[in-house]
């Protein structure tokens, strides 16, 4: 922070592309990465890249590697490629919400047509995803059509998409024939796909292995129980789902993954199981998938011998399969599964139903053909043969195909993928949290991966039980939740949360529909009304101190928890907590920092005396000085809450005072200290994401390190008179770390007394402000800028402590009218010399001010119009295609020179059309289909004319005045248009309106994730 509020952050002046540049693209996998430890803007732990073999790391996402040595293309290859490219499509898609192992994302990949008549495309399972999917494909001639999931394998990395062949009018669609039997060591291949996000890339290689185990990709989706094919082709991002073709033009494998360390090695999925699935889908039959809930891996004979493989058995296997070099060994056996008491880790698989088994393909085939039946399995353990009977389960039954949304979060049963990774039982494991938000946003920070064990002291072993428990819980009831994280199943966590059934009223269930390719949403429970709060008794802690009157201020502090269902105004969080100061105990008025409570579309909960929970409502928000007044019902509080005495005189530099604060651990701290400085500061503006910041105020600093660790507190005299408030001030987001800076500073109490007295009298202050941001100039600067010696002398006499004047640093845009200009030096307002921030307070109650200024070395007297603050706060927002739109808030007007439109993008949801087509926070939407949209009403009117799944044009202006045009496709199923309007007649203070789509989809509940500078969407 500096005196001028300068910030070193930089925003890209150009528009953001729909996807990241290829250098930032996550390669192979579809999840764009910004750096080595982030996934699509969400911090990712380094340990997510799991070592498969010694010193080897494999990833669905790998950095772009140098292309392997190109093989000279013969005429035969050229003819083959010409035919293949007509079957290859570029897939642009969104996984619209977090589900199982997959976060909500928007990206690109590759697929290829495998049935031109019925319209089937083969691609990867990590492209199709386990959850809701929307996407379209682009053919070689740039014709486009929508695609819908038909099948995604529960384990193996392939999925099948459906398209309408009739939609392709200008080229003959051809299909590639799947020939898994042609994949052999030494075969020359080409990978034809959307490599590194480019339209078409053709990479060459030679198959080197057919028998490597499936690579582990970490905590996300991983394939297993199959062998992979290895080749050096150096494919990268966007190549997921590419066909691997031989010289004759047959697809011999499916591109799936590769190395994360820059090596050119690639891993392909064999096509045996995709071919079987395709044939069943063609016939309209169900794709049966069997399992004994055991992961097998291929181990060479030397390792098998160490595990106890007998010589006789090795000889028998080698004789029957002379080309085999290993056998299948049990790696993970799930507890309470079909094999849990019969098969152990390290057991060598010998026979199934009397047949020697050495390959995954044959094992898969037997299991898939025996779902619901019993198979006979021979294993060898420490040299001893064992015969066991195993019941074959249905793999689809342990793969979630539904999720429930309640209180802003989403849940489903634990999946086989997660259970296999952590070797835990699928039975009664608890409910998996796939989107930890709303009432279930736990303080530990993980967005998913939680297993809910108990809710409101009732066990929740599975999703159905969880739904029944949640149906009965009233709105706003505080409940106890017990939960574990998959990473640490040893630790049971306990939290208390308030159940939100008002912002997120209905419990809704989403079920996968493989016929339509969509997920069907259905409300299953209306909210149970809240139980009225009752009066409760409590006592405050008593602190022993040398300053008993001062520490008694502890009776004036209450803990504040703010929960925001929607991100507005560029604010980076959806939950904040801190402390507030009771300013009137009789009326229940509490002062809170705007770094904790940025806007009034929220739930405010106070904890009084660390004992009583009570709800509060916003009464007043100060536009400049960083505080909010909230009100609770004092009749519900039977506790000795104290109204402090406030000083009417400004504290001065050098004065002794007592610092009383609440530190990061919410513990009170006391220290005798001295005021080191009182200066007019400028909180740095956040260039990446404009959000509320205090301006034009004098900040107090003190000589104690406790102050820097305390976000709330007071400076108080020994007799208990509060001299200043100690508040948190939200600052800039640093460009190097992406973290938000908070400053802790003091605000003298005389600044707030006039407003506080007005609120106490029952009035709501209607302030007027100057639409400018000032910075201080010293006399040396003022003289150069044209301030006369007379005024310099008057300044020095009027304020012996601070020889300074105010210069206009920035004029807020969008308010219009004549007034001060940037660079003007302010001398007087209504005849009073202005040398300190409190001298500006005359603006609060005057529509017009007479100002004496120096402009370009000329002294002038001008009439300045102040701006009413009633409309400064955001009072209306629209969620459209995943973008949160509202009028540019005050922070935007403070930073920008021209307001292009009153339709401003504040945030966007991952996996949404807004994200997919490149709309970014801080953009302005100025036209819809060439019709100007200067405000939200016009915008809503125009977008209502657009049909579902229909393309439209948006004219967009970036924050830095660069215009561009976006073409988007509307999606009402998953992203209905929802409007929130401030309405004091509503119980919540806001009215919710759903436009067009009454059922709503994955984002109807409005727990929209923000996108701010690529760090948080």
From Swiss-Prot:
Gene Ontology CC terms: nucleus
Basic and acidic residues composition-biased segments: 25-38
Disordered as annotated region, ranges: 1-46
Source species, domain of life: Eukaryota
InterPro entries in alphabetical order: PDZ (IPR001478), PDZ-like_dom (IPR025926), PDZ_sf (IPR036034), Peptidase_S1_PA (IPR009003), Peptidase_S1C (IPR001940)
Serine protease, as annotated region: 88-278
Compartments, as annotated in UniProt: Nucleus
Chief localisation class: nucleus
Location of the PDZ domain: 305-383, 879-960
Key words of the record: Apoptosis, Hydrolase, Nucleus, Protease, Repeat, Serine protease
List of catalytic residues: 126, 157, 239
EC number: 3.4.21.-
GO biological process: apoptotic process; positive regulation of apoptotic process; proteolysis
GO MF, one annotated term: serine-type endopeptidase activity
Pfam entry (one): PDZ
Family named by the database record: Belongs to the peptidase S1C family.
Role this protein plays: Nuclear serine protease which mediates apoptosis.
Protein name, UniProt field: Pro-apoptotic serine protease NMA111
Origin species: Phaeosphaeria nodorum (strain SN15 / ATCC MYA-4574 / FGSC 10173) (Glume blotch fungus)
């Amino acid at each position: 922070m500096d005196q001028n509020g300068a910030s070193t952050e930089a925003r890209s002046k150009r528009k953001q592309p729909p996807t990241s540049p290829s250098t930032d693209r996550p390669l192979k996998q579809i999840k764009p990465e910004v750096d080595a430890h982030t996934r699509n803007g969400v911090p990712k732990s380094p340990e997510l890249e799991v070592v498969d073999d010694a010193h080897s790391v494999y990833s669905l996402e790998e950095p772009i590697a140098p292309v392997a040595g190109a093989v000279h293309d013969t005429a035969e290859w050229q003819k083959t490629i010409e035919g293949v490219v007509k079957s290859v499509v570029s897939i642009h898609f969104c996984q619209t919400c977090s589900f199982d192992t997959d976060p909500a994302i928007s990206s690109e990949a590759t697929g290829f047509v495998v049935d031109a008549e019925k319209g089937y495309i083969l691609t990867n399972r990590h492209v199709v995803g386990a959850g809701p999917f929307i996407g379209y494909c682009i053919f070689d001639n740039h014709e486009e059509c929508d695609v819908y999931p038909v099948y995604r394998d529960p384990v193996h990395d392939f999925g099948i998409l459906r398209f309408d062949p009739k939609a392709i009018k200008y080229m003959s669609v051809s299909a590639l024939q799947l020939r898994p039997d042609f994949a052999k060591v030494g075969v020359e291949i080409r990978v034809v796909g959307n490599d590194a996000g480019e339209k078409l890339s053709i990479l060459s290689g030679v198959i080197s292995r057919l028998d490597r185990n499936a690579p582990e990709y970490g905590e996300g989706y991983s394939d297993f129980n199959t062998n992979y094919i290895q080749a050096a082709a150096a494919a990268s991002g966007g190549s997921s789902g590419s066909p691997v073709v031989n010289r004759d033009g047959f697809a011999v494998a499916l591109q799936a993954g590769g190395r994360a360390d820059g090596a050119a090695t690639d891993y392909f999925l064999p096509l045996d199981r995709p071919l079987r699935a395709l044939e069943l889908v063609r016939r309209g039959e169900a794709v049966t998938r069997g399992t004994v809930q055991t992961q097998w891996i291929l181990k060479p004979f030397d390792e098998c011998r160490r595990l106890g493989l007998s010589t006789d058995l090795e000889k028998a296997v080698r004789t029957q399969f002379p080309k085999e070099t290993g056998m299948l060994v049990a790696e993970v056996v799930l507890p309470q599964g079909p094999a849990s008491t019969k098969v152990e880790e390290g057991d060598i698989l010998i026979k199934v139903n009397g047949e020697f088994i050495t390959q995954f393909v044959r094992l898969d085939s037997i299991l898939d053909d025996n779902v619901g039946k019993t198979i006979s399995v021979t294993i060898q353990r420490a040299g001893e043969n064992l015969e066991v009977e195993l019941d074959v389960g249905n793999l689809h039954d342990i793969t979630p195909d539904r999720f429930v949304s309640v209180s802003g979060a989403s849940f489903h049963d634990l999946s086989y993928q997660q259970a296999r990774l952590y070797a835990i039982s699928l039975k009664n494991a608890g409910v998996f949290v796939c989107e930890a938000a709303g009432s279930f946003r736990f303080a530990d920070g993980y967005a998913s991966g939680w297993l809910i064990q108990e809710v409101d002291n009732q066990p929740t072993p599975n999703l159905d039980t969880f739904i029944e428990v949640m149906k009965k819980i009233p709105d706003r009831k505080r409940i106890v939740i017990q939960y574990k994280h998959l990473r640490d199943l040893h630790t049971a966590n306990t939290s208390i949360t308030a159940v939100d059934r008002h912002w997120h009223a209905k419990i809704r269930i989403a079920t996968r529909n493989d016929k339509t390719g969509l997920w069907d949403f259905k409300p299953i429970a209306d909210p149970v009304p809240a139980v009225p709060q009752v009066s409760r008794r409590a006592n405050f802690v008593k602190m022993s101190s040398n300053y008993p009157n001062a520490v008694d201020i502890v009776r004036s502090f209450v803990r504040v928890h703010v929960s925001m269902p929607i991100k507005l105004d560029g604010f980076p969080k959806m939950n904040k907590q801190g402390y507030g100061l009771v300013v009137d105990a009789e009326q229940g008025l509490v002062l809170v920092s705007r770094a904790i409570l940025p806007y009034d579309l929220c739930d405010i909960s106070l904890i009084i005396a660390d004992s009583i929970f009570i709800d509060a409502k916003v009464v007043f928000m100060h536009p400049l000085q960083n505080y909010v007044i909230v009100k609770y019902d004092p009749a519900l509080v039977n506790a000795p809450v104290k109204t402090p005495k406030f000083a009417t005189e400004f504290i001065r530099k050098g004065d002794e005072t007592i610092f009383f604060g609440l530190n990061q651990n919410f513990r009170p701290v006391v220290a005798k200290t001295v005021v080191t400085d009182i200066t007019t500061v400028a909180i740095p503006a956040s260039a990446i994401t404009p959000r509320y910041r205090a301006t034009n105020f004098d900040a107090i600093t003190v000589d104690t390190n406790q102050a820097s660790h305390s976000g709330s507190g007071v400076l108080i005299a020994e007799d208990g008179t509060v001299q200043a408030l100690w508040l948190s001030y939200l600052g800039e987001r640093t460009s190097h770390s992406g973290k938000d800076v908070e400053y802790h500073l003091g605000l003298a109490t005389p600044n707030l007394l006039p407003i506080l007295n007005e609120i106490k009298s029952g009035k709501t202050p209607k302030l007027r402000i100057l639409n400018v941001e000032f910075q201080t100039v010293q006399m040396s600067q003022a003289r150069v800028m044209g301030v006369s010696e007379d005024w310099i002398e008057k300044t020095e006499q009027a304020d012996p402590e601070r020889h300074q004047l105010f210069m206009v640093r920035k004029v807020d845009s969008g308010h219009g009218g004549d007034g001060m200009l940037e660079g003007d030096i302010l001398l007087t307002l209504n005849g009073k010399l202005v040398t300190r921030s409190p001298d500006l307070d005359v603006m609060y109650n005057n529509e017009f001010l007479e100002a004496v200024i120096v402009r370009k070395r000329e002294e002038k007297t001008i009439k300045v119009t102040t701006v009413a603050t009633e409309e400064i706060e955001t009072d209306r927002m629209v969620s459209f295609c995943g973008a949160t739109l509202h009028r540019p808030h005050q922070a935007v007007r403070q930073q920008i020179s021209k307001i292009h439109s009153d339709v401003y993008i504040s945030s966007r949801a991952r996996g949404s059309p807004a994200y997919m087509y490149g709309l970014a926070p801080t953009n302005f939407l100025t036209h819809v289909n060439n019709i100007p949209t200067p405000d939200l009403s016009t915008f809503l009117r125009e977008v209502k004319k657009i049909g579902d799944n229909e393309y439209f044009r948006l004219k967009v202006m970036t924050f830095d005045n660069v215009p561009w045009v976006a073409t988007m496709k509307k999606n009402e199923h998953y992203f209905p248009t929802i409007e929130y309007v401030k309405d004091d007649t509503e119980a919540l203070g806001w009215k919710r309106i759903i436009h067009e789509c009454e059922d709503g989809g994955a984002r109807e509940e409005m727990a929209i994730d923000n996108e701010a500078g690529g760090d948080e969407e």
